[in-house]
């Protein structure tokens, strides 16, 4: 993994964004950017299978709102909660958009066109939970592209 910036540098960048965009929703902007990149990775095909790896906190919220956009675009989107309590509003929105919750066991027997990692953000701590390690190992072995 390549370090792009530290958590403190990212917090400072976020604060700069908030200062420049008072009243705007950074999560909505981030989720839309993730959905746009996911669409580019999926190509011009509807009905692709997408797995969203969901963590607690705002990073998970970004992924859930991106999942909502992807489902609204006609993709089959599944949600795997792997760490913490998912962002409540994002979880409700994703389920209402037709996304489906799956278990780690479900995932191991499926094929996906894309996986979106929205587990850890700037609040992440050292040590990777076992379920996330197993899921990451499966993704590598399956050749599933990860955003």
Predicted regions and their residues:
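Glycine-rich phosphate/dinucleotide-binding loop and adjoining beta-alpha-beta core of small-molecule
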Residues: 1-5, 43-147
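Positively charged, low-complexity intrinsically disordered leader regions
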Residues: 1-48
């Amino acid at each position: 993994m390549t370090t792009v910036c530290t958590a403190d540098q990212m917090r400072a960048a976020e604060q700069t964004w908030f200062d420049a965009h008072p009243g705007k929703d950074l999560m909505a902007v981030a989720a839309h950017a993730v959905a746009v990149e996911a669409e580019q990775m999926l190509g011009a095909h509807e009905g692709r299978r997408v797995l969203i790896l969901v963590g607690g906190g705002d990073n998970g919220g970004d992924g859930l709102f991106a999942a909502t956009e992807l489902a609204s675009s006609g993709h089959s989107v599944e949600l795997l909660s792997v760490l913490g309590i998912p962002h409540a509003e994002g979880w409700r929105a994703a389920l209402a958009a037709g996304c489906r919750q799956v278990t780690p066991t479900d995932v191991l027997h499926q094929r996906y066109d894309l996986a979106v990692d929205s587990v850890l953000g700037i609040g992440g701590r050292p040590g990777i939970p076992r379920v996330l390690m197993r899921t990451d190992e499966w993704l590598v072995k399956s050749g599933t592209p990860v955003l």
